[in-house]
């Protein structure tokens, strides 16, 4: 039976070979082929044979595991060599369900069983072996940065803006919006405060006459270059001239009446002390030195005192008013300052 099974594929293949002559013996040709081909040793029924695959492919014993095929009946050898004639002589060949089909079904079942187990293991152990989540990047709001240097710079600008706002609240009549103009107002205000403190302190010590003389000497020595009553700081041009003129006006008004000088400074928004206190200081100082100057000014027929008279102040204000109305350091025209001087003189006369 083994010989018949071995001769089956050879007989089918020999049918396609054309003999060169009619006297050629088929049995001799088959014997020559079988003797030259390296056939495997005959395996008895006790040991299973490795299958060559259902599609004619050889099984590599070194790389793939040997597939065991049960030997239920005598058709196992026929099924083993049946792959030679699948592509040629048997186009409608079907895999037998008894021998090989069961093995394929078993393999499919094992594969489908291992897949749910793998998915279940990943589902149970996903929490333990899960990859670490990436840190979410904090996005800044529009117009703000997350860099530490940018944050520090923004905080510094906010502090500067708060300080500038506080300074602007301290300066009276300060309505500038840009920083440059705001700083100019603050500088002018500080200069006039220094002047007022200087004048008041010297008036308490030596009287208003000494203050006016020192202011005149300082203005004559330094000229247009600097002003000694503004801390000795040097400014250029019209700003220095206007500061010097204002100092002379305040000194002259303080010689007559300190209250009028305070009113003049209050009109400019530069009054530091109450007018009543300044009037009391001026009255006490004038009583200790001379009679009141307004009484001498009211005497029209008598000669005017050499220090100050109403006509002198009016002539000074007229000269200042005859200009073109240039701006001084506080942004007030010289014409308006002359009007303020006239008003101060009229108040002192009353």
Swiss-Prot record:
Function in brief: Transcription factor that regulates the development of root hairs. Transcription factor that regulates the development of sperm cells.
Region of interest: Helix-loop-helix motif: 158-193
Stretches with biased composition (Low complexity): 106-133
Main location: nucleus
CC terms in the record's Gene Ontology section: nucleus
Ranges for region Disordered: 1-22, 97-152, 219-241, 318-350
UniProt-listed Gene3D superfamilies: Helix-loop-helix DNA-binding domain
GO BP terms in the entry: microgametogenesis; pollen sperm cell differentiation; regulation of DNA-templated transcription; root hair cell development; root hair cell differentiation; root hair elongation
All copies of domain bHLH, residue ranges: 144-193
Pfam families the record matches: HLH
Expression triggers: By cold, UV, ethylene (ACC), flagellin, jasmonic acid (JA), and salicylic acid (SA) treatments.
Knockout or disruption consequences: No visible phenotype under normal growth conditions. The triple mutant lrl1, lrl2 and lrl3 exhibit very short root hairs. The double mutant drop1 and drop2 fail to develop sperm cells.
Annotated localization: Nucleus
Positions of region (Basic motif): 144-157
Quaternary organization: Homodimer.
Gene transcribed to yield this protein: LRL1
A molecular function (GO) term: transcription cis-regulatory region binding
Keywords, in A-Z order: DNA-binding, Nucleus, Transcription, Transcription regulation
Biased composition annotated in UniProt, kind: Polar residues: 223-241, 329-339
Lineage, top ranks: Eukaryota, Viridiplantae, Streptophyta, Embryophyta, Tracheophyta
Protein's recorded name: Transcription factor LRL1
């Amino acid at each position: 039976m083994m010989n018949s099974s071995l001769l089956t594929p050879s007989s089918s293949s020999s049918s396609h070979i054309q003999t060169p002559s009619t006297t050629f013996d088929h049995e001799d040709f088959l014997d020559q082929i079988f003797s030259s081909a390296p056939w495997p040793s005959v395996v008895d029924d006790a040991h299973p044979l490795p299958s060559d695959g259902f599609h004619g492919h050889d099984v590599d014993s070194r790389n793939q595991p040997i597939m065991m095929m049960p030997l239920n009946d005598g058709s196992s050898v026929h099924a083993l060599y049946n792959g030679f004639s699948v592509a040629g002589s048997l186009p409608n060949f079907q895999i037998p369900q008894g021998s090989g089909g069961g093995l394929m079904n078993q393999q499919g079942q094992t594969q489908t069983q291992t897949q749910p187990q793998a998915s279940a293991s990943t589902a149970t152990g996903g929490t333990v072996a899960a990859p670490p989540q990436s840190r979410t990047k904090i996005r800044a709001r529009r117009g703000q940065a997350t860099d530490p240097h940018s944050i520090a710079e923004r905080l510094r600008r906010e502090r500067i803006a708060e300080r500038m706002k506080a300074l602007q609240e301290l300066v009276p009549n300060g309505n500038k919006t840009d920083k440059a103009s705001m700083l100019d107002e603050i500088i002018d205000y500080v200069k006039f405060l220094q002047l007022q403190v200087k004048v008041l302190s010297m008036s308490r010590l030596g009287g208003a006459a000494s203050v006016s003389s020192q202011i005149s000497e300082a203005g004559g020595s330094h000229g247009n270059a600097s002003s000694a009553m503004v801390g000795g700081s040097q400014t250029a041009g019209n700003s220095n001239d206007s500061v010097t003129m204002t100092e002379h006006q305040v000194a002259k008004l303080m010689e007559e009446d300190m209250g009028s000088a305070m009113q003049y400074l209050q009109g400019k928004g530069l009054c530091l002390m109450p007018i009543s206190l300044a009037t009391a200081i001026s009255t006490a100082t004038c009583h200790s030195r001379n009679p009141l100057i307004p009484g001498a000014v009211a005497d029209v027929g008598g000669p005017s005192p050499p220090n100050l008279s109403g006509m002198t102040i009016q002539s000074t204000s007229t000269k200042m008013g005859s200009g073109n109305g240039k701006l001084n350091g506080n942004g007030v025209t010289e014409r308006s300052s002359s009007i303020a001087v006239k008003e101060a003189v009229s108040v002192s006369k009353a």
